[in-house]
Amino acid sequence: MDPEAVELEKRHVHSVYENTAPYFTDLQSKAWPRVRQFLQDQKPGSLVADIGCGTGKYLKVNSQVHTLGCDYCGPLVEIARNRGCEVMVCDNLNLPFRDQGFDAIISIGVIHHFSTKERRIRAIKEMARVLAPGGQLMIYVWAMEQKNRRFEKQDVLVPWNRALCSRLLSESHQSWGHHCEHPRSRGFQGPGSVCGCAVCFKGRCDSKRSHSMDYGSAVARTCCEAISKEGERENGLYSNFGKSFRSWFFSRSLDESTLRKQIERVRPMKIPEAWANSTVSQQPSRHPSLDLHAPEPFSTKGPNLDEVFVDTSSQRHLGWLRTPGTSDNFSGHKGGGSRRKEGGNFLDITDTGDSVAASNSSDPSARKILRRVSAFDSNDSNSEDSSFLEAQRDATDSKAFMRYYHVFREGELSSLLQESVSELQVLSSGNDHGNWCIIAEKKRSWD
């Protein structure tokens, strides 16, 4: 047992998803094309497991196979169960399945949440254990090498954006013709919504969307400063990140990219002067919630995030790497060995007894967002100062919703399997919109 890793994952993975799960109740997102294709390629009657299924997005892609989902997060499992999926709560490090029981397994956006190399290996080995010989395993993880964003370390914290979720919930309700009298998720109240209905919140702040983005900028700015100072008091919990604080705002995950789809374009923001004066190395936000369409700082304009949802035949820019003599599951060029091995970075953590704020009707951040929006109804010349003070008070809550990720270098995931999980053979690997993906097959006894 590695208590530091367990505590880190508890605070910055499990607690975050448990408290943000209500935001996913009414959100509908599309299956990623490559994952969908992998599931549809399975033989009829196959038994498929989705380890880390979340709300069950991939459990009904192929009606010709039997799919079982499991996730560590109980609230997400409950959402999937309410959607008619066969799901259960379990731990990826100790799967409650017999050996060699599944014909195929998918692990989408899970392995990068394990905070040590040993735990990542254990998670993959456990999936290999329950995979039948000849069965295939698909794994997606965040990539360190991304076209329009940069990570300076492999172990990073990424802020969860509740305001963005609330906006999409609002737009989803409106597009379905729902109003306040329609049922809402248990225990969920959208930020700034007096009655708890996301539509009401949208109606009040539709004309102030750009102001709400300014609010997000202030939160991002003060969040870094407050966390940096508190990290010093916590014996360096966050001090090991250094410049990796900058990478909070240069990242995108599978779930966050789905939230971007329906958001309207808003004006770019100016770079706040306080960014340059902060003691923590920071840069303007590239997180989807904070700066949606500012010019890309590191490259020319890249593909829109919506392109991940187009038909796979149109994804010409997707380059897949194949190991010699493997199947033709993906088209692409050959090559792509391991550039360098894992750096072994890990975060020192000290338990301060902080509790994660739950997303309920008494959520203080909800009232603060409402007050911030209301401030623009007046001609108060000090509205910007008040927003800064509000953001400072929100800094602690923002820290509570920071998610941990280990971002993988090119070739690192393949090397991890080849060196530490000998029962698996990598068939193909590639980069899919900022994520490394591999497909591996479990070796037969005579291989």
UniProtKB/Swiss-Prot annotation:
Source organism (scientific name): Mus musculus
Region of interest (Disordered), residue spans: 274-306, 320-348
Keyword GTP-binding tagged: no
Biased composition (Polar residues): 276-286
Role of this protein: May modify wobble uridines in specific arginine and glutamic acid tRNAs. Acts as a tumor suppressor by promoting the expression of LIN9.
Domain of life: Eukaryota
Family: Belongs to the methyltransferase superfamily.
Name of the gene encoding the protein in the UniProt record: Trmt9b
Gene Ontology MF term list: S-adenosylmethionine-dependent methyltransferase activity; tRNA methyltransferase activity
Enzyme Commission number(s) from the entry: 2.1.1.-
Modified residues (Phosphoserine): S212
Name of the protein in question: Probable tRNA methyltransferase 9B
Main enzyme class: transferase
Keyword flag Methyltransferase: yes
Pfam families: Methyltransf_11 (PF08241)
